[in-house]
Amino acid sequence: MAPASLLDLVSALPATESWGPAVSDETMLDGVPFAPYSKGDKLGRMADWTEGKDRERGGRQQYGNRNYRDQQVYGANQQTNPFAIQAAEEEATFSVVDNTRTSTRTRGFGRGGGTVFGRGRGQRGGQAQRGGRGTFQRVGGRGGQQYDSRGGRGGGRGGRRFGWRDDKPQRNRDASVQVKPEWTVMEEIDFSRLGKLNLDTGDGEDLENYGFLYYYDRSYDKQPGAKTSERRLNVLERAAYNVTTSSDPILQELSDKDEATVFATDNVLSMLMCATKSVYSWDLVFSRKGNKVFIDKRDGSNLDMVTVNENAADAPLEISEGNKDSINSPGALMLEATHINNVFPLQVVSESDTNKVNMTHEHPFYNEEVETDPPASKAYRYRRFDLSLEKDDEPLHLIVRTELDAVVKNNINGEDQYLTIKALNEFDNKAQGSGGALDWRSKLASQRGAVLATEMKNNSCKLARWAVQSILAKADTMKLGFVSRTNPKNNNDHVILGVLTNKPRDFASQMALNLNNGWGIVRTIVDMVLRMDEGKYVLVKDPNKSLLRLYQVPLHTFEEEDVEDMQAPNEEDEE
C-alpha cells in the first residue's frame, strides 16, 4: 500500500473542527478577528491560555470583584488614562502620587520653561506657561505604597494609607484688605509661575546714608542657651519710624532727579521678593505716576507685623477655629513678636556718645521739637539696583530704602561692620501651633542647629524676608536673638536666651533662598504695572490659595479711609 501524502491527510480532517480557541461571532468584525481596545489601556498579553473567565486568582475569593480586577478588560485602566476627561468639580481634591524616583536636579528655565531674565544674553525663555495638574510627589517612606486615589490598603514598612482622613478641610483665612466692588482684576499669577522667574542683579550701589548707629554689646553673644546668659527683656522708649515709600522725602527728591524708575522700602520689597513663601494674606499698593512706580504699604497694614509659625504644618489656630488660648492665637502672637522686635534691638546696643557712629546726613524723620523720646539706633541706606535687560530701550533702576540697626568693630582689621538685629520668640512648645519646636531653654546650648532648622521650617517666610532685607542693606552680619516667655501662660514678660550670628548670604543659602527669583518677581510685577495706564493698583495675596491678584483701584482708595479715621476722634470729642 502506497504511503498517504500530507495533502491527503489534511483533506481527510473534519471541516468543522479546528485547532485553538473556538471562533465566536462576538470577537469578529466583518469576518476579521477583533478585540476591543482603549488607548488608555496598557498593552498586555496577546493571549492568556491559563486564565479562564470563571477562574479565581490564587484561590482568593473575589468578593464582588473588589480585590481582583482584570486589567485586560476594555477601559479598565481609565484612572491613568491621560485622555480621560476629569470633572471640573473634582479637580480641587484630585491628587496623583507617583512611585518613580525623581531627580533632585531641576530643569533650567530654557525653551518653554517660564521667563528667564539674563543681562547680556537677553531673555532666553518664553512667557511662563500655566502648568497642568500633572505634578507628582514622592510620598511616604520605603516600602510599598498604594496609588489608588481611594486609599487602598496600607503600604509596607514606612508606607501609609492615603484616604479620606487626609482630606482635612482647608482653613478659610480672611484677606488682608477688603476687595471693593469697583476694583477691577487686571492679572492673576499663581506661585508656580512666579517660582520659574529669574533675574541676575548685582549687589547695588549706595546713594545716600542717613541717621546714626550705636555699637553692639558683644556680651549678648556669650554662650547662647546657657542659664548664666539669660537676661530679662526690658522695654525702652525710643522714637522709631516706619515711613512708607510715598511719604519718604528722600525718595521723593531722588524721584524728582530721575535717579530711578521704581521706588520702594526694604519692608515692602522683601515681601514681594519672598511672595512664594507666604501663607497669610498681604497687600501692596502700586502707584504709577508717569514713568515712575512707587510701591507702598497701607497704614495699619499687616506688613508691619511679625508673623509667628506662619509656615508650620499646623499653624496657630484662630479663636473662632477652636483655639482656647487667646494669647496663642495668630493675632496675639503677631502683636507679641512685633513688640519683641521693636525693643530687642534697642537693648543689645551700648547707648553713649562715645559708642556712636554718625552717617553722612542726619536722621531724615526725627524732629527734636516734636519728639519727647530720643531716637532709636537706626541708619538708612538708600541703594540703587539695576533691573535692566539687554532688550530694554531704556535702563530700569530701582531705589530702595534699607535699614541697619547697629555697628561692631571687626576683631581682625578693626573696621566697622554693619548689623541688622532681629529676634525669634518662643511662646509654648507644647501648645497647638508650636510646629514641633524644641524647648529652647534645654536645647539651645546643645542643639542650636536643630533649633534653628525647626525655626527655618516653621517661619521660612519671615526669616527669608529678614535675610533679604539684610542683603539689600549690604549688612555684614545678621544678629538673630532668641527670646522666650518667662512663663508660657504670660505673654508680657520675656527673657533673652541668647544671640546667634550669621552672614546674610550664608543664611539665605541655608534656607535655599533664591535671590534671582525674587528679583525676577519684582521685574515681572513692575512690567505689568508699566504696561497699564497711570493710576493706582493693589497687589493682594489670596488668603486661601497660592495666588496673587493685581487690582486696578480708584485713585483715592485708602485715602478716604484715612480721612474718616481722622474725623472720627473729632466727632467723639464734640459729643
Curated annotation (Swiss-Prot):
Keywords: Cytoplasm, Initiation factor, Protein biosynthesis, RNA-binding. Coiled coil: none annotated. The keyword Protein biosynthesis applies. It is found in: Cytoplasm. One of its GO terms (cellular component) is eukaryotic translation initiation factor 3 complex, eIF3e. Component of the eukaryotic translation initiation factor 3 (eIF-3) complex. This is Eukaryotic translation initiation factor 3 subunit D.
